[in-house]
């Protein structure tokens, strides 16, 4: 099996160029200068229509730290649900070590230890966790 060549891009045009250059999966976001934010609904839809490879969507309402307010968690939850409804392959989220979003029912903050992170969704669990390696 060939290794997955995932490329992080911040626009539809960059996604097309990455696929043409050999990417087998895309991480789609905007504003990489601030670490990446959630791309627009229109960009996500266009990628679904045109990209021949799966892509992950960055879910992040703003740049800066990874400590989010309750309102920001609700925004993130809505973005995740929209991605699910559209049929997006997956989403990418980043959180501080101690505050994790529960995606079941209402938005809740859960205290979890640094290495015991499990995300539960209505129909099951996330199947991948991407770490920085520390």
Question: What residue spans do the PLM features occupy?
Answer:
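N-terminal pre-domain/capping segments
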Residues: 2-24, 31, 38
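Glycine-rich phosphate-binding active-site loops on the catalytic face of alpha/beta enzymes
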Residues: 24-37, 81-99, 134
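Catalytic cores of alpha/beta
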Residues: 10-21, 67-80, 125-134
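Alpha-helix N-cap and loop-to-helix initiation/capping positions
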Residues: 35-43, 68-78, 100-101
